[in-house]
Amino acid sequence: MSITPAKKSELISEYKVKDGDTGSAYVQCAILSERIRNLTEHLKIHKKDFHCRRGLMVLVCKRRKGLQYVRNKYGNDAYLDLVKRLGIRDVFH
């Protein structure tokens, strides 16, 4: 359900804005998206794992707030680009 350090560093290198960037909104949204994908796969197998389902909802809300931050701070084009790169739905349009 968690992501491996190798996968995390791969996501950081793919979504970083500059060298040494590990905590920008882009990177955080990418890491949250990967964790959400892992939990979704887990819940397909374990349908009655309600504690995990609640954790998934918390992560989805955190990612939505991060995407909203990107949209407000960097503009709609940067937001749409990030959504496209992550392969998720646009939640604000």
From Swiss-Prot:
Keywords assigned by UniProt, alphabetized: Ribonucleoprotein, Ribosomal protein, RNA-binding, rRNA-binding
Hydrolase in keyword set: no
InterPro entries, per the entry: Ribosomal_uS15, Ribosomal_uS15_bac-type, uS15_NS1_RNA-bd_sf
Alphabetized CDD domains for the sequence: Ribosomal_S15p_S13e (cd00353)
SUPFAM superfamilies: S15/NS1 RNA-binding domain (SSF47060)
GO molecular function ontology, one term from the record: rRNA binding
Disulfide bonds: none
Ligase recorded as keyword: no
GO cellular component: cytosolic small ribosomal subunit
GO biological process, one term: translation
Family: Belongs to the universal ribosomal protein uS15 family.
Subunit structure: Part of the 30S ribosomal subunit. Forms a bridge to the 50S subunit in the 70S ribosome, contacting the 23S rRNA.
Function recorded in the entry: One of the primary rRNA binding proteins, it binds directly to 16S rRNA where it helps nucleate assembly of the platform of the 30S subunit by binding and bridging several RNA helices of the 16S rRNA. Forms an intersubunit bridge (bridge B4) with the 23S rRNA of the 50S subunit in the ribosome.
Name assigned to this protein: Small ribosomal subunit protein uS15
